[in-house]
From Swiss-Prot:
Keywords: Leucine-rich repeat, Repeat. The gene is PRAMEF12. LRR repeats lie at residues 97-122, 177-201, 202-228, 229-264, 265-290, 291-322, 323-341, 347-374, 375-399. This is PRAME family member 12. GO terms for cellular component: Cul2-RING ubiquitin ligase complex; cytoplasm. Belongs to the PRAME family. It comes from the Eukaryota.
Length: 483
């Protein structure tokens, strides 16, 4: 017969606190701070809303990372937490142990709860994230309470917790500092976005992603808010279209309205654009407005003119560039000089270069090779999808001998791998792949390298040849179509 172990002190405290709400305040006054997180988790799990309200008031840590505990919206619990904040805000003089300054609604700090429950140790990454949260700019002096959240607009509506919080926050304007670090837009009416932005401190926003199709006219309505995000580091724009109905002079006015916002962004470093056309012939206007060196320029499947590339190559802000991605921009008829100059400008810092599916031909490749060979920090190079001969590829590989940090290399299948009609000759591709691998191994020891074909017209998959001959890959649906 086994004896049941006596309940631990923590379990007794949980039972006492959660059984009798009237006992909560006196108990919390004397409770060791180490017991607060596990007790809070237990009250959260049991949905003891009155107890949660009381614990929020008496929280003995500067930060309450609620977001990592509340994985999905539970309006009842969320209201209980906000009621605790109301009680805290109403206190003109707080008890010494009541230290809550930050309510963090982001899902970033699971280890806070894990360490108190004994599940894990607090990681340096988690500590870093919590310190970062406290570095938010606070204009006009310290605010009594900061609420940190990331905003993600999708499915056309706001979730009920966010809706409730925004309404609650409006009624307490001046008492709260609502800090949003990341803003993601996947689909919602622009007037709803503006309504939300009017409730947060725009100075706090560091990353913005617009991942839904917008007309240029909608982007322009958003642009003034972008200019107020003075700590913005990263901007992502997907599928910004220009209506055929917009007159040319009106479009140019829109471009000025958008690009001028960058004059106010002193810390901007990372520009990502996919399928954006309105800057064609106007990229120089944006580049002139940049206030800080760029680390990342990603412009994929965008419309750019040769003059745009030339302006980019001479822009002072790209001299510390770490990532350049021009994937899907057709460069076939461009002079190779701007790209060569661009690589020269960034040769000391460039780590990632993606020129996939740019339509680059042998003569252009030959012109940029001297600059490419001096990019000493390059670790990732993607060049597949270009129309390059066997001789030009061998020359390219020879020019990578000094690039000791290369860890991922993606190259196109040689033109000789295809027949006159453009169909892949699989046997020929395998033979040429083996020759290229031998050439490369005679020069240096590659880490990850792949030679791949153009996408199959039937399935869209690229056949590839990597370091080991046994790893030649060919999509099964295409077997019959290859020689």
């Amino acid at each position: 017969m086994s004896l049941q172990a006596p309940p631990r002190l923590l379990e007794l405290a949980e039972q006492s606190l959660l059984r009798d709400r009237a006992l909560a305040i006196p108990t919390l006054e004397e409770l060791p701070r180490e017991l607060f997180p596990p007790l809070f988790m237990e009250a959260f799990t049991r949905r003891c809303c009155e107890t949660l309200t009381t614990m929020v008031q008496a929280w003995p840590f500067t930060c309450l990372p609620l977001g990592s505990l509340m994985k999905s919206c539970n309006l009842e619990i969320f209201r209980a937490v906000l009621e605790g904040l109301d009680a805290l805000l109403a206190q003109k003089v707080r008890p010494r142990r009541w230290k809550l300054q930050v309510l963090d609604l982001r899902n970033v700090d699971e280890n806070f709860w894990g360490i108190w429950s004994g599940a894990s140790a607090l990681s340096p990454e988690a500590l870093s994230k919590r310190r970062t949260a406290g570095n938010c700019p606070r204009p006009g002096g310290q605010q009594p309470l900061m609420v940190i959240l990331d905003l993600c607009f999708k499915n056309g509506t706001l979730d009920e917790c966010l809706t409730h919080f925004l309404e609650w926050g409006k009624q307490r304007k001046g008492l709260l500092h609502v800090c949003c670090k990341e803003l993601q837009i996947f689909g919602i009416a622009i007037h709803r976005i503006i309504e939300v932005l009017n409730t947060v401190e725009l100075d706090c926003i560091q990353e913005v992603e617009v991942c839904c199709p917008w007309e240029l006219s909608i982007l322009i309505r958003f642009a003034p808010y972008l200019g107020q995000m003075r700590n913005l580091r990263k901007l992502v724009l997907f599928n910004i279209h220009v209506s055929a109905c917009i007159p040319l002079d009106r479009k140019e006015q829109f471009v000025i309205q958008f690009t001028s916002q960058f004059l106010k962004l002193d810390y901007f470093q990372k520009l990502y654009m996919h399928s954006v056309s309105f800057l064609e012939g106007h990229l120089d206007q944006l580049l002139r407005c940049l206030q800080a060196p760029l680390e990342t320029v990603v412009m994929t499947e965008c419309l750019l003119s040769e003059s745009d590339l030339k302006h980019l190559s001479w822009c002072p802000s790209i001299r510390q560039l770490k990532e350049l991605d021009l994937r899907g921009i057709t460069l076939t008829h461009f002079s190779p000089e701007p790209l060569s100059v661009l690589l020269e400008q960034a040769e000391a810092t460039l780590q990632t270069l993606d020129l996939e599916d740019c339509g680059i031909v042998d003569s252009q490749l030959s012109a940029i090779l001297p600059a490419l060979s001096r990019c000493s920090q390059l670790s990732t190079f993607s060049f597949c999808g270009n129309l390059i001969s066997m001789a030009a590829l061998e020359n390219l590989l020879r020019h990578t001998v000094g690039l000791s940090k290369l860890s991922l290399e993606l190259y196109p299948a040689p033109l000789e791998s295809y027949d006159a009609q453009g169909a892949l000759c699989w046997g020929r591709f395998s033979q040429l792949g083996a020759e290229l691998m031998k050439t490369l191994r005679d020069l240096r020891q590659p880490k990850i390298i792949v030679f791949s074909t153009v996408p199959c017209p039937r399935c869209g998959i690229r056949a590839s040849y990597d370091l080991e001959p046994s790893h030649c890959l060919l999509n099964a649906c295409c077997q019959g179509g290859f020689i």
